[in-house]
Amino acid sequence: MIIHLYTLGGILFLALAGCVTQPRISYQQDVSPILEAKCLACHLPPKGTGYLKSGLSMASYESLMQGTIYGPVIVPGDSRHSVLNMVVENRLNTSMRPPQPLTTEEIAILRLWVDQGAKNN
């Protein structure tokens, strides 16, 4: 009887775990405000330091997706290989660091947005 209850409990847990969905992240409502607050001062053309060094403009969704003179910074659907995520998560040995570090929540929002396809929504 006890084994049956554990089995039933395990099945119920797995069924409920599958029902939990991640929140949909919006570029306009969630991502853009983070970039404006933490990144735009350096990545704003024509004179932002980050823009001058890399060509990366974060002034719009389109310019962000265009990337740098070296290539893209976002791989839609893959935050693990997106340079943006590597930089804000300190997974990349670089001098590119936001003057004001992102919070754990802001990093999670950027990661989830990229993993959800980095859409302009």
Language-model segment annotations:
Residues 1-2:
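N-terminal secretory signal peptides that target proteins for export/translocation
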Residues 6-17:
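Bacterial N-terminal signal peptides
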Residues 19-121:
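Aromatic- and Gly/Pro-enriched helix-to-coil junctions and flexible linker segments
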